[in-house]
């Protein structure tokens, strides 16, 4: 899944942070 839009990139970054915190 590759996103080019800045909004999608920011959303993906936030999603990774959420997954990281949930994985703790």
UniProtKB/Swiss-Prot annotation:
Asked whether the UniProt record includes Hydrolase among its keywords, one would answer: no
Task: Give one Pfam family, short name only.
Answer: PqqA
InterPro entries xref list:
PQQ_synth_PqqA (IPR011725)
* Crosslink site: Pyrroloquinoline quinone (Glu-Tyr): 16-20
Query: Part of which pathway?
Result: Cofactor biosynthesis; pyrroloquinoline quinone biosynthesis
What GO biological process, any one, is recorded here?
pyrroloquinoline quinone biosynthetic process
UniProt keywords (A-Z) are: PQQ biosynthesis
Q: What does this protein do?
A: Required for coenzyme pyrroloquinoline quinone (PQQ) biosynthesis. PQQ is probably formed by cross-linking a specific glutamate to a specific tyrosine residue and excising these residues from the peptide.
Q: Give the protein family.
A: Belongs to the PqqA family.
Protein name (Swiss-Prot/TrEMBL):
Coenzyme PQQ synthesis protein A
Lineage start: Bacteria, Pseudomonadati, Pseudomonadota, Betaproteobacteria, Burkholderiales
């Amino acid at each position: 899944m590759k996103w080019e839009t800045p909004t999608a990139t920011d959303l993906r970054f936030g999603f990774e942070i959420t997954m990281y915190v949930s994985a703790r």
